[in-house]
Structure formats: C-alpha cells, structure tokens
C-alpha cells in the first residue's frame, strides 16, 4: 500500500499507518474467529433442490494486486483467466448464504480443484456430505457440477435443467464474494504493498464479511430462506 492510497483511504501517512495501525491489525488477525465451519450442519441449511446431504457451495474470489517487477514472483499472480494480477481465496458458503470457510491467499495460477484438494485438512467433511461447484470442480470427489457440452455433445433438456438448477443455487457463492469485495480496501486501485500485509487485510475482511452476513440475516431478514429443520443425513 503506497502513501497516496493510504492517505486517501485512512487520512494518514504511510509511516503513521504502518506504525500505529498495522500492529493492531496483525494482533486482530491472530485473534479474529468469526467463520464457523460447523454452521454448514445447521438443520435449516437446506434447499428444495438439495434437501439432503449437500452442505456447501464452493467457489473462488480474487484480490487484485500490482504487477510485480520481478517475474520470479509475478508468474504466480498473472493468469490469463483474469485481466489483472491477483491472488485467489477459496470460499465455501452454506445453502443459507453464510460464509463457512475461506482459505488463505493462493496463487492465481492454481486450479480451483487443486486448491480444494490441497486444503482438505482445513475443511474436513463427513463421508456422506456432498458439495456444489462450478465447472472447475468435476475432478473433486462428492461434487455436483454442471454438465459440459464437450466433444460435440448436445445437452438434453434434462441436462440443461440440471445446469440451471446448479447455477441458481451456486450463485449464492457470488453474493458472498461480493460482500467480501465490498470492503473499501479492495475497491479501486490494485493493492500495493507486502503480501504479508495483504494476507492480514484479506483475513480480517473475510471474517468481517461472515459477521455481516449473519447480521443481515437477522435484520432486514434472511436473503436465502432456509428449509427444515431436519438432519442432512437421514
């Protein structure tokens, strides 16, 4: 984060921000704990399309950064899928729209399925649990993903309906990602500064988004009405 951006957002110089704010932010980063993985098992965490077994919707969100001058580092944050250098964070959202998992910063050249498999130890699930993801997760076990029209295959009406159902439900991940990205730290210009500081800001913003989603569920009311109560594994 450069001096101009710091003064624009916080009304203080870069040196003052690093001296007075960053130590507090680092301590807060170590203590913050508002993302609750077990909320996925809430008896109201159901959808009419997926009344049993499905607990999480998965996706990734990106955080834009300045292009590094050294390609030895820049090669990890430049991906042709995006028009800008960035880091990725994998997120999991309950069917009720609550943020239940967020990974650390991942290189943007990493494939979503590989990130999921590499972080399995951070989000253990029961053998009966199922997940919903987009076309980047078909190689992951226990995932429902869209059917692709590859090799000349023409989707049948049933397959088209299935894809529409998945997209309708999985769009809840995109809403949660929008709440995360609405933090003013990530608006406008790309992040400039040390990756270790970006990690702190991203983690605090992720936990803050989890709190905001829970507060919004109480007032003005749930954005996504839960169904139940009943167990996920009947």
Language-model-detected regions and their locations in the chain:
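Short, well-ordered secondary-structure "scaffold" segments embedded in the functional core
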Residues: 2-234
């Amino acid at each position: 984060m450069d001096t101009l951006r710091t003064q624009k957002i916080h009304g203080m110089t870069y040196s003052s921000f690093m001296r007075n704010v960053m130590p507090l932010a680092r301590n807060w980063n170590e203590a913050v704990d508002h993302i609750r993985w077990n909320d996925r098992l809430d008896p109201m965490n159901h959808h009419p399309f997926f009344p049993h077994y499905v607990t999480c919707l998965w996706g990734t969100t990106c955080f834009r950064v300045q292009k590094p001058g050294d390609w030895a580092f820049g090669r990890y944050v430049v991906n042709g899928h995006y028009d800008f250098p960035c880091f990725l964070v994998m997120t999991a959202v309950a069917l009720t729209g609550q943020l239940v998992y967020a990974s650390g910063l991942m290189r943007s050249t990493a494939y979503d399925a590989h990130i999921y498999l590499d972080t399995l130890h951070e989000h253990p699930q029961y053998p009966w649990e199922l997940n919903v993801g987009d076309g980047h997760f078909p190689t992951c076990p226990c995932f429902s993903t869209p059917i692709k029209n590859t090799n000349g295959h023409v989707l049948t009406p049933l397959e088209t309906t299935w894809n529409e159902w998945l997209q309708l439900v999985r769009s809840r991940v995109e809403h949660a990602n929008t709440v995360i990205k609405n933090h003013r730290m990530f608006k406008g210009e790309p992040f400039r500064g040390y990756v270790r500081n970006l990690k702190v800001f991203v983690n605090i913003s992720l936990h803050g988004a989890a709190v905001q989603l829970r507060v919004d569920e109480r007032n003005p009311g749930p954005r996504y009405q839960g169904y139940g109560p009943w167990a996920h594994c009947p």
